[in-house]
Amino acid sequence: MQEQYQPAAIEPAAQKKWDDARIFNVSEDASKPKYYCLSMFPYPSGKLHMGHVRNYTIGDVLSRFKLLNGFNVMQPMGWDAFGMPAENAAMKNNVAPAAWTYDNIEYMKTQLKSLGFAIDWARETATCKPEYYRWEQWLFTKLFEKGIVYRKNGTVNWDPVDQTVLANEQVIDGRGWRSGALIEKREIPMYYFKITDYAEELLNDLDKLEHWPEQVKTMQRNWIGKSRGMTVRFAVSDDSKQGLEGDYAKFLQVYTTRPDTLMGATYVAVAAEHPLATAAAADKPELQAFIAECKAGSVAEADMATMEKKGVPTGRYVVNPLNGDKLEVWIANYVLWGYGDGAVMAVPAHDERDFEFAAKYSLPKKQVLQRVTIGLSPEQEEAMGFGGGSGCGAGYGDGSGSDSRDLPFMPNKWQAWYGVKDDFMVLINSGELDGMNYQTAFDAVAAKLQAIGAGEPKTQYRLRDWGISRQRYWGCPIPIVHCEQCGDVPVPADQLPVVLPENVVPDGMGSPLAKMPEFYETTCPCCGGAAKRETDTMDTFMESSWYFFRYMSPKFSDGMVDPAAAKYWGAVDQYIGGIEHAILHLLYARFFTKLMRDEGLVNVDEPFERLLTQGMVVCETYYRENDKGGKDWINPADVELTFDDKGRPVSAVLKVDGLPVVISGTEKMSKSKNNGVDPQELINAYGADTARLFMMFAAPPEQSLEWSDSGVEGAHRFLRRLWRTVYEYLKQGEAVNAFAGSQDGLSKELKDLRHKLHSTIAKVSDDYGRRQQFNTAIAAVMELLNQYDKTDTGSEQGRTVAQEVLEAAVRLLWPIVPHICETLWSELNGAKLWEAGWPAVDEAALVKSEIEVMVQVNGKLRGKITVAADASKADLEAAALATEGAVKFMEGKPAKKIIVVPGRLVNIVV
């Protein structure tokens, strides 16, 4: 065995050993329990970043742990290869996106292999390959025929210069990111998936996901947004019908979750695209200008929630069906046409957004909710937001101080007034509804509106149908042919895939496919006449919504997934990825699983049994202000820091010139802040095992990991120490058989070492398996090696115990630092580590013959005693009373009482 730890030599050798033995290439094996571990596949952007390293190391630790525990482990890898970055890079470098993507895949694959991940590369897939997206197109056509996929007009951001649709993130201050042109909203035909048909199941099945973070499930519940409310129809005033047709001339329909507050409505707001807005603007230039302004704004719901609320009155009126009040209709920029009916009733006294709007335009506010606090304690009032001098008022405002208080509306308390639906909130100023609580009023309003045909109860979801059309090139072609005679015709299965041409260099001006007659000119599958192929491509979330099933049988040519493989592998047992994917990707993956189940392709309801959302990798940021008032971000490697006596950075200078730079704080590693660390440089300097160890030891997996050069060096020191420990053991003689059998003849010191060993095995097993806390597992092995170093193992028995400890330590660490452990195992044992299995806990070793017990006097620690593990209560009391500390602090006084906690402490009360 060589004396020095040399990762550059041992890591390639270990990887070759695994590759030659094909230990990570798996197939269905009914004799073993299966374990499908999957980390979210990467976008082939060019290079791995530290977030990738952390993500895939977590998955690898779990995979290797299960492999040693006898599971049939599948850990595949592939590439989420379609998407906008490839098009942008293609335009920048004048290269086809396909060539750029495939080059990146090869480089990143080399990087992944250098980290020693236990990946079954025989299952590798790339979503831009026709053999992959063929089956995506096939499912699309099946669902189109069933009506689950449909076509309708959708609103998009249109760049009039580049003649293309832009994503919301490509619109900067209302202008196209590339052309700088003012963006327009346009209505264009798009394809949608009816995810709303599955909203209830998607919501209910969250309760089945026992091993998902609650935060993720809450985010999905909120995104689905189930609400119970009512559809309310406000009759259009007779003097407001001009220009309106059909039902729009009869009534304005809204959805509300608070029909109990209908008497508090003081105006109605509609979206700019609403027919009533269009009719009102016909002869009013100021309305036309405002509608144009709204249409030029963002189409993102999140942006609308935060933008300044603006509106204009239409001069049109509708009638409140409960009290006959005429309410003015406003066009407001915060109302979405694609959400619900594109109209909302406004109750400014009890809704934050409505209050903000009404205050801006001096619109009336009518309070219809009152908090009743009879019999409540001050503490209960405070908990509800109305106690402790909150300023919400006490009494009726007439000085009576009555216990039955009308707490007046305060805008800063709007949530307490409107968001709470309990018996402490009752209606006022609502006629016959006065005094009713939420539920009673809801039922009364529902009955009244239904009786007069002005509304009915309705359950609604915030979730919208999923629009998957993208007017871009680098994506999966939509398999539809447009025929003037037959309409929209799905491409037959025997004509799939519709192959995307790969030799295209986009110029950013419109859709390349729409300029290629050789692509779009075709014949109708139904009538054989001339037809045009769809030139939109699919949202790239489509590919990532089912790739985990394709891994089960990536070369299967008769369907999306081999039925036998799908039955064996079932759901992914462990999924790993960032919480930023909590809503879209994870929701779409759940949706696709249910679609595929309903097509008879898979036999599971949910795709991922257990979900781990790892934290970000963060690092310090530094900058200098430039002449333009901006910031030039400086890489941490180029900065020299000065620290105070507590190790905190107090100043920083640029190494090349010694001049100050600004310390800007810790942020996620990113190109924009220039605070990334290249994993390849780390691997070249310290080896893959050091990178893996640091990533797993620096923080629990679900928390952010702060980059630390000293932490990396510390990880490398530990691996050198591990190597040196085994080297020194073997230097003293050849490896022996590990200790086995009864430990009756062992010294106390060796028994203590074995106790530490087997308690460590138990802890590390729990840390890897149940808790998934890898940093504490590493710390436990470090503690074990510390005790090993302090134990004399020079005797013949000692060497057998030493062999047992070192063999176990190497296996315990193999999931995290597999290269060094593989090499050390070969030196210690000579066999194949992956065949050795996980070390078993010797229960006998956990039983200690002697234990240490604390001695207290009046509750304060005054000493410790070592006694037999089975010592009686009387023996413990006698031993404690005899200790030097007890004698000193009892000061000759008799013990009033002696409290014994078996195995832990004796407390003498004097």
Curated annotation (Swiss-Prot):
One example of a Gene Ontology biological process annotation: leucyl-tRNA aminoacylation
GO cellular component: cytosol
Annotated ATP binding sites: 671
Main localisation: cytoplasm
Keywords: Aminoacyl-tRNA synthetase, ATP-binding, Cytoplasm, Ligase, Nucleotide-binding, Protein biosynthesis
EC number in record: 6.1.1.4
Enzyme class name: ligase
GO molecular function, one term: ATP binding
Residue ranges annotated as motif 'HIGH' region: 42-52
Record motif 'KMSKS' region, residues: 668-672
Entries under SUPFAM superfamilies matching the protein: Anticodon-binding domain of a subclass of class I aminoacyl-tRNA synthetases, Nucleotidylyl transferase, ValRS/IleRS/LeuRS editing domain
Family named by the database record: Belongs to the class-I aminoacyl-tRNA synthetase family.
HAMAP family: Leu_tRNA_synth_B
Entry protein name: Leucine--tRNA ligase
Organism of this sequence: Neisseria meningitidis serogroup A / serotype 4A (strain DSM 15465 / Z2491)
